[in-house]
């Protein structure tokens, strides 16, 4: 089996780019869809697919104004504390819109819907449809069912709730993804089987299920044909990917990366989110063998204390994490590293926190998603005694964020005079002679250039540091089109 099996015929060059921008309209005759997305990149991806789905099936176009929408969808996240109350608070505002327009359709999806489906019906009976992350592909059918029973007496109406966990069938029913720009996200697996003591994901998205290899490669090849040059592979535990091959075998995540790198047009590869347990030597080797792999890694660790990691049921030690990063930086010395940190986990002592702070300083993280611990109902950690005062947790969090911010500033400053590989994404909104792109490390890079170069990779020498995430540069070399 080779990757050519999955490449569509007639792949287009970047100059024949067929990028489609999202449609927004003020035409009152067109049916309009508003989606509020909360939480992670998986939810962002799912929301895009909902828009694709309802656009293809029922002709809905996106609007950024909920007041003019015919359908309001909320794609919810349950990671943080009070997530449920945030949902009901927003639904209260939507209720007023429905009182003004009884034909308005309201749907709630995502992880809070999985957890709180029955409760949503009780507390917000004006919600018409409730669906989970694994059943969003059934939205067109649910919408048809809703319209079919609008005139029925209340007691005859069927409750439109589908928060089941079917096999990973939703991708079989989703339309071809629309392309917006030169980057795209591709979901390769759903759920997580790690059962960390603090996490709700296994309960809201189910256990790990991988998409078949041929489906993933075909989707990416199709995106490349439409001009996409950077792919971000998505999953709750993306490096745990075990996709079935056409021949009936199993493809691992490192093997998938090698196959994706063969697809004409794909010049850059990212992925999120990964787990240290499955950050294997085979995966690290990909960074040496595949130039498409960016020198940026998001690898959640959650804490720098072995005691806390044990209580979290992360099943690895700090030394294991440090060893993996050392191997990676031996191959890529310029590797930028980001992570997740939970501060104030039950039982975290002053000594535990000091270990975490020193760990962060030693590894030089570039960015983090760091939060004070939130008790999530139904998780093992919710039963642990939590004696740390809230103000202490917040003080610790502020220290972590300050250390990481300083590290990020230093890493941005270190870019001065260096040559960065940049994907040129657009012409500046402020100046038609300025181009805007993204470096491997996610910094925005601006420089003087012609609009015809948009969609290409270029070598840019960094000449000025403007802000933490914005640098100026000078074009040195324009790479040949990768298609």
From Swiss-Prot:
Top enzyme category: transferase
Function recorded in the entry: Catalyzes the methylthiolation of N6-(dimethylallyl)adenosine (i(6)A), leading to the formation of 2-methylthio-N6-(dimethylallyl)adenosine (ms(2)i(6)A) at position 37 in tRNAs that read codons beginning with uridine.
Residues reported to bind [4Fe-4S] cluster 1: 40, 77, 111
Entry's cofactor comment: Binds 2 [4Fe-4S] clusters. One cluster is coordinated with 3 cysteines and an exchangeable S-adenosyl-L-methionine.
Family as reported in the entry's similarity comment: Belongs to the methylthiotransferase family. MiaB subfamily.
Annotated CDD domains: Radical_SAM
Boundaries of every Radical SAM core domain copy: 178-410
Complexes and interactors: Monomer.
Keyword Lyase among record annotations: no
SMART domains associated with the record: Elp3
Protein's gene: miaB
Cellular compartments annotated: Cytoplasm
EC number: 2.8.4.3
Catalyzed reactions per annotation: N(6)-dimethylallyladenosine(37) in tRNA + (sulfur carrier)-SH + AH2 + 2 S-adenosyl-L-methionine = 2-methylsulfanyl-N(6)-dimethylallyladenosine(37) in tRNA + (sulfur carrier)-H + 5'-deoxyadenosine + L-methionine + A + S-adenosyl-L-homocysteine + 2 H(+)
Name recorded for this polypeptide: tRNA-2-methylthio-N(6)-dimethylallyladenosine synthase
Annotated Gene3D superfamilies: Methylthiotransferase, N-terminal domain, tm_1862 like domain
Cofactor: [4Fe-4S] cluster
InterPro entries in the cross-refs: Elp3/MiaA/NifB-like_rSAM (IPR006638), Methylthiotransferase (IPR005839), Methylthiotransferase_CS (IPR020612), Methylthiotransferase_N (IPR013848), Methylthiotransferase_N_sf (IPR038135), MiaB_methiolase (IPR006463), rSAM (IPR007197), rSAM_horseshoe (IPR023404)
Positions annotated to bind [4Fe-4S] cluster 2: 192, 196, 199
Record flagged with keyword Mitochondrion: no
Listed GO CC annotations: cytosol
Record domain TRAM: where: 413-477
UniProt-recorded Gene Ontology molecular function terms: 4 iron, 4 sulfur cluster binding; metal ion binding; N6-isopentenyladenosine methylthiotransferase activity
Start and end residues of each MTTase N-terminal domain: 31-148
Keyword vocabulary terms for this entry: 4Fe-4S, Cytoplasm, Iron, Iron-sulfur, Metal-binding, S-adenosyl-L-methionine, Transferase, tRNA processing
